[in-house]
Structure formats: structure tokens, C-alpha cells
């Protein structure tokens, strides 16, 4: 066995192990709610795992993803063989097609420099086209095939607002929670990246002039999350405290790296959607729930762009400062004409 074959087999085994563990685990973690008497996901986290694995391994993750979802579907859902095949196609085809198109448009390195390059294309194709493609294929499958009543609502049998929330759960999973799996999995696969992540994102928090600010910021975030996710009901605090979280994360853009901000934002959103008894107090309709999901998705996009804009401005500022220092050094020397 040559080295290339060995590396491919090694990557396949690692990707398969990740899928077999992370896909069922993410399905278990996925927050849910009741809309019009039917159970609906608020964020379908297996899509986040799929995206993270694709971004890590590329086309070599296709077979592990198919096997991981096949095993998960067999374990959780009782269907006929044809229904299993149709369900697997609906879950994965749109993602594979969108990633293939991105590779054609951006080249072989389309998975690199996240999130520094081609933000708009990645958000459009992976954050919106993939979820819409998954739901359109499921609606078409529900029209052509019969599925059990327990899952028929996911194939277009639910009300309009139910379907809207269902689509938003996929968009939210792609845009908010993908990095929540991407960074930890990358650190598990490559311990060197874990050291890099510590040095770039975590260590400066404790050994920096803004360490007091970060400590107070984390305490405030934890307090607000504890209040919103507490097991009690209060119409006074409910969702009215939610804007404070947006303000906190906006303030942190200039002091934390995007990798750490995205992890903290995903963890905060997951807690809010999972322990939502107080956070969603007074939300009695699918329309209100749809609005809340829209706000979370919109802020995730804004957070990405604001972080990117700040990072770019810092790069430009360092470039200008370096140019100024170089100009000052040259200004200390007499001109060649004067010397001659």
C-alpha cells in the first residue's frame, strides 16, 4: 500500500468515525418546538455536521456522510428500503451539488480561508440554497412517495407557517451552528490547530490589556443566558433581554477573534433554543417563532460581516503604520543629490 492510498484510507476512517458519532449526537442536540400541534426542529444540527465534515475533508467525506446518515436513519426511523433511499437522497444531494458548484466557481481551494474570502458566495450557496434544496427535494418526495404519519409533516404535509419554520431550522443550522462543529472537529483531527486556536483566540483573553473587559463581558453573557434559559416563567424578562446579547456580541467584535465569537454565539443560540421555556415566553404562534428565528439568522450574518470588516480595517491600519515607519526611517537619510 503506497502512501497516497494509506492517507486516503486514514482520512476515510476518520471521517466515517466522526459521522457515526457526530450525526446521531447532533440529532439528539437539535432543539425542537411544537407548531400547530406538530413537532418541528428549531435547528436541524445534522446539516451543521455535514457542512463541517465537507469543509474539513472535501469530496472524500461524501461516502462517510452517506454511511453515517444511513446508519442514523436506520436507528431512528422505521421505513421501507425505497423510503430510506429517498430520504437519504433528500438529506444529502443538495449539499453535494452546492459544494460541487462552489468548487467549479472558486477552484480547488474553495474550502480554505474561512471566513476571510468569498463570504457572500458561501452564505448564498451553503446557507440558503442548500436548505432550500433539501426542503424542495423533500416536498417533491412527499408528493411522489408515501411516508409514515410521524414524519409526513417534514415532507410538505404541514401548514404553511410550519414549513417556513422548518426551512428556517435548516438555514439556522447552516449559518449559525456549522462553526460550532467545524472548529472542535478540526482541533480533534489536527492537534496543531488546537495549539494555534489557543494562541490566537484564547490566550490573548487572559494575557492582554483588555482581560478585565473580557472577564466582565463573559460574566454578563453568562448571567443573561442564565436568566433567559432559567426554568421559570416571567413575561417581564422573557425575550425583552435578547437585544442585550446582540449588544454584547457587537462589543466583543473588536476584542475577540471570529472563531471564538462564532463558537460563543452558536453556544448561546443553542442554549436559548433548547431551554426556551422562559426565552420564548408569550410566543404562542408559529409566526412569532418564525420571526425569532429570522432575527437569530440575520444577526449571525451581521456578526460574520462585522467581524470581517473589523479584521480588514485592522490589517489596513497595520499596513499604514508599517508604511509610515518605513517613510520615517528613509527621511532620516540625506538625499543622494545633496550628498553628491
Indicate residue ranges for each PLM-predicted region:
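Short helix-perturbing small/polar motifs within transmembrane alpha-helices
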Residues: 2-41, 50-148, 178-190, 203-241, ...
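Conserved nucleotide-binding and Mg2+-coordinating catalytic segments in signaling enzymes
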Residues: 320-340
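Transmembrane helix-loop junctions at the membrane interface of multipass transporters and ion channels
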Residues: 144-151, 274-286
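Short aromatic-rich membrane-water interface segments that cap or initiate transmembrane helices
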Residues: 157-172
Amino acid at each position: 500500500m503506497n502512501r497516497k492510498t494509506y492517507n486516503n484510507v486514514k482520512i476515510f476512517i476518520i471521517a466515517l468515525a466522526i459521522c457515526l458519532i457526530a450525526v446521531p449526537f447532533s440529532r439528539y442536540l437539535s432543539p425542537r418546538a411544537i407548531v400547530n400541534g406538530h413537532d418541528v426542529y428549531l435547528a436541524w444540527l445534522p446539516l451543521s455536521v455535514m457542512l463541517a465534515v465537507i469543509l474539513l475533508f472535501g469530496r472524500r467525506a461524501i461516502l462517510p456522510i452517506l454511511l453515517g446518515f444511513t446508519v442514523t436513519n436506520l436507528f431512528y426511523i422505521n421505513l421501507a428500503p425505497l423510503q430510506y433511499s429517498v430520504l437519504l437522497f433528500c438529506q444529502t444531494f443538495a449539499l453535494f451539488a452546492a459544494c460541487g458548484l462552489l468548487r467549479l466557481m472558486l477552484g480547488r481551494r474553495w474550502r480554505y480561508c474561512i471566513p476571510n474570502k468569498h463570504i457572500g458566495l458561501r452564505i448564498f450557496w451553503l446557507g440558503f440554497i442548500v436548505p432550500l434544496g433539501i426542503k424542495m427535494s423533500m416536498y417533491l418526495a412527499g408528493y411522489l412517495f408515501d411516508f409514515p404519519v410521524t414524519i409526513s409533516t417534514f415532507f410538505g404535509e404541514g401548514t404553511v407557517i410550519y414549513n417556513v419554520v422548518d426551512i428556517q431550522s435548516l438555514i439556522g443550522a447552516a449559518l449559525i451552528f456549522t462553526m460550532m462543529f467545524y472548529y472542535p472537529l478540526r482541533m480533534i483531527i489536527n492537534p496543531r490547530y488546537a495549539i494555534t486556536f489557543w494562541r490566537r483566540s484564547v490566550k490573548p483573553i487572559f494575557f492582554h490589556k483588555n482581560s478585565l473587559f473580557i472577564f466582565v463581558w463573559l460574566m454578563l453573557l453568562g448571567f443573561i443566558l442564565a436568566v433567559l434559559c432559567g426554568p421559570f416563567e416571567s413575561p417581564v424578562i422573557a425575550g425583552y433581554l435578547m437585544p442585550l446579547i446582540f449588544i454584547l456580541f457587537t462589543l466583543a467584535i473588536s476584542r475577540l477573534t471570529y472563531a471564538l465569537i462564532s463558537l460563543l454565539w452558536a453556544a448561546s443560540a443553542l442554549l436559548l433554543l433548547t431551554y426556551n421555556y422562559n426565552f420564548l415566553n408569550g410566543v404562542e404562534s408559529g409566526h412569532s417563532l418564525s420571526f425569532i428565528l429570522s432575527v437569530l439568522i440575520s444577526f449571525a450574518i451581521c456578526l460574520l460581516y462585522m467581524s470581517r470588516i473589523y479584521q480588514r480595517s485592522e490589517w489596513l491600519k497595520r499596513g499604514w503604520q508599517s508604511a509610515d515607519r518605513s517613510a520615517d526611517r528613509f527621511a532620516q537619510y540625506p538625499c543622494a543629490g545633496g550628498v553628491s
